[in-house]
A protein has these predicted regions:
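Outer-membrane beta-barrel domain signature, strongest for Gram-negative TonB-dependent receptors
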Residues: 71, 93, 99-238, 244-247
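Transmembrane beta-barrel strands of outer-membrane/channel proteins
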Residues: 48-52, 76-82, 120-124, 190-192, ...
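Membrane-embedded beta-strand positions in outer-membrane beta-barrel channels/transporters
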Residues: 12, 32, 47-49, 59-61, ...
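Flexible glycine-/small-residue-rich
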Residues: 17, 37-39, 230
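Signature of Gram-negative outer-membrane beta-barrel scaffolds
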Residues: 90-96, 108, 243-303
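Short acidic/polar hinge/loop motifs at secondary-structure boundaries
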Residues: 1-17
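Outer-membrane beta-barrel translocator/receptor signature
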Residues: 7-11, 22-89, 94-104, 112-116, ...
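Extracytoplasmic loops and strand-loop junctions of Gram-negative outer membrane beta-barrel proteins
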Residues: 15-16, 44-47, 86-92, 152-160, ...
Length: 303
């Protein structure tokens, strides 16, 4: 939740193929996508981008960077992404597959010395796009639910509207980087994130209140990572330690009103509560040695 959002204020995107667990830990067996945010400029900068398209699409971003002193810089970015829906919910009248997102980010860099820098950043995002409800590809076979297939694949008959679709996420980070000498650098990354979301999930995509799931999700996580980086003529790499404390809470109903009526159990539903806490730590290292200009040998491990 809170992860599938448009990306802005990014310098580059790195697609890392294959297992990346040595450096990035859990859930990276198939690879990782790394977003590198744009650093702050020593010169005043301002950039504006606007994109327009069909379905009344208007996307806009504003980014700015300002050097306050020779050693202190601040920056900010805001973004808005809006588009009408491709389809329509024939029951509620809402647009289906629309987009309504807002995001903002502020950052600051402070050079405490020529070889020591602090970087702080905070971000906020809000997604109020309607829930993307499903489209049935075959008609129902059981009366009285003989609904014909809709002509537009983007249209839906989902009737659940107990909660609105809403995803709100925010977080911050503090990075300290100390260049000890030409070869060694110490880097510390402190971060916190939190998100809250509500989502109406209509599994049968029909107006009847059956297999309808209004869901609420809340997540937060704190992480700390300390790295010792080495850069030499042929050998490059790092060793580090990592700690994560995360919590995830979920509350959702499975509304089974139609099934309950058939079973003489009016108002049948199954309510589920979930609360998961995760605390994890690791030590890791990864080094690459250049054998020639074309060949290199990498060795890494994580515990």
């Amino acid at each position: 939740q809170g992860a599938v959002l448009d990306v802005y204020d990014v310098e580059r995107v790195e697609v890392l193929r294959g297992p990346q667990g040595t450096l990035y830990g859990r859930n990276t067996i198939g690879g990782a996508i790394k977003y590198v945010t744009r650093g702050l400029s020593d010169e005043p900068t301002f950039e504006a981008n606007v994109k327009v398209g069909s379905y009344s699409q208007i996307d806009g971003t504003l980014t700015t960077s300002l050097p306050v002193t020779d050693s202190f810089r601040v920056g900010a970015a805001i973004a808005s992404f809006n588009r009408d829906g491709f389809g329509e919910n024939r029951i509620t009248g809402e647009e289906n597959y629309n987009k309504e997102l807002f995001g903002a980010r502020v950052s600051a860099e402070l050079d405490l010395a020529e070889n020591f820098q602090l970087r702080a950043a905070a971000d906020y995002s809000l997604d109020k796009s309607n829930a993307r409800q499903g489209h049935r590809l075959i008609p129902d076979q059981f009366p009285p639910f003989t609904y014909p297939v809709l002509g537009d694949v983007f249209d839906t008959r989902a009737g659940l509207n107990a909660v609105d679709q809403r995803v709100e996420a925010y977080g911050g980070s503090l990075v300290a980087e100390w260049d000890l000498n030409d070869n060694w650098t110490i880097k510390n990354i402190l971060a916190y994130r939190e998100d809250e979301s509500t989502s109406p999930i209509d599994f049968d995509s029909l107006p009847e209140a059956d297999v309808d799931v209004p869901a609420i999700y809340e997540n937060d996580q704190f992480s700390e990572e300390l790295q010792f980086l080495y850069s030499g003529d042929r050998l490059n790499g790092l060793i580090g330690v990592y700690y994560l404390d995360a919590n995830a809470s979920t509350v959702f109903d499975v509304l089974l009103a139609t099934t309950g009526d058939l079973l003489s159990l009016p108002g049948l539903n199954a309510q589920t509560f979930g609360d998961v806490g995760t605390e994890t730590w690791s030590i890791f290292g990864d080094f690459t040695y250049d054998l020639t200009d074309r060949w290199s040998l990498s060795l890494g491990g994580r515990y």
